[in-house]
Amino acid sequence: MYAQVPRATKDIDIILVVEALSAEFVAKFWEFVKKGNYEQRNKGVNENVEPKHEYFRFMKPANSAFPYQVELFSRSLGLMNFPEEARITPIPVDEDLSSLSAILMDEDYYCFTIDHSLQENGVHIANIESLICLKSKAFLDLSQRKAKGESVDSKHIAKHKKDVFRLAAMLTPASRYELPDTLKTDVSDFCDAIMQDLPNADFIKSAGLGNVTSLQIIEQLKKSML
């Protein structure tokens, strides 16, 4: 185990797992939105999957104590019924959803993340192995979109790659996980994609990953998950 150097972050990914949504929750969440006085309130539907997925995005709160952006995803339509005063507009077609949240709409990723999480006081905290899978998939998705000419910040791609290495450095020889075929393929594709552009020794040192190389980390990742 390595004493990794803490890395500052400006956002936190929180996944709300609600299998049976109540009107009380919707009312409470709407109170949260009003107190934050969110300027941008959008809604969208993913028409490319069955059943169709619904998502909401709230951004730019007037109250700086509130999160800058909140996204809600539902794998069923019509579960989130906000009052008419909400004034929710369609998500602009040129805007995209956060990678990790969108990935969780996939059944295999959703179930694996829930199954591979710690539960403290009723809150699921994703384990190392599920975070590695999510970050690997996000890296692949963003890389593919950039290759198609879409506007994708290379810094986001690099961040996901480095996050995988930070996480994989915590795997031990005893770490063994059985992944669904979908996730196993994605992790394998990630490993193949980064072999020609492994993080250098400066990154390993600055991240506090100890006396180890990027190649050793990726080899352990393969042994643990493939």
Regions found by a protein language model. Name each.
Residues 1-226:
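Compositionally biased terminal segments of proteins
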